[in-house]
Amino acid sequence: DEVLGLSELPESMLIIGGGVIGCEIGQFFSTLGTEVTIVQRGEQLLPFEDKDVVKQLQRQFKKDKIKVLLNSGVDSCEVVGDEVVSTLSDGKKVNTQYVLVAIGRRPNIENSGIEELGIELNRGKIVVNENLETSVEGIYAIGDLINTPMLAHVASKEGIIAIENAFGKSKTVDYTAVPRCVY
């Protein structure tokens, strides 16, 4: 959240994560002249997008001199002088002025009392059935709390469906054609 408020333009930046946020921020800073390296654990950037579209993006990133390291991770980062030395999973080191962690968000449900209610969690998300009901009958969850696309319009639709189901309906959300964009 703080990266766009930097008081000076970084000379170099390592971005951990090649999802939407990592790619958008990387391209933004590259356009301004920052030397950008993106490290992505998976085999492609934007893992939820079409492979052909991602190939085009990677070609553009190459033209923009954005370095992309796929199937790689960052094991550690250490501030040394005015640089950050990042050690990659293959042992190589990358020196940059800044490191941006863009590996996604998780719901902040610690100390919320959810576990005391007996609501089942899986990897930090609330488990729901097809009707958005949790493991506790009569309690529903939507949006970023559950394992569905983290988009406002998805959460809005889920909210409508959850309310209808709380009043006795048995409706589900169709996730097959969720509009989204990458800037």
Regions found by a protein language model. Give the residues of each.
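Rossmann-like dinucleotide-binding cores of NAD(P)H-dependent redox enzymes
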Residues: 4-5, 10-14, 20-85, 89-90, ...
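FAD-site-proximal beta/loop scaffold in flavoenzymes
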Residues: 1-10, 95-172
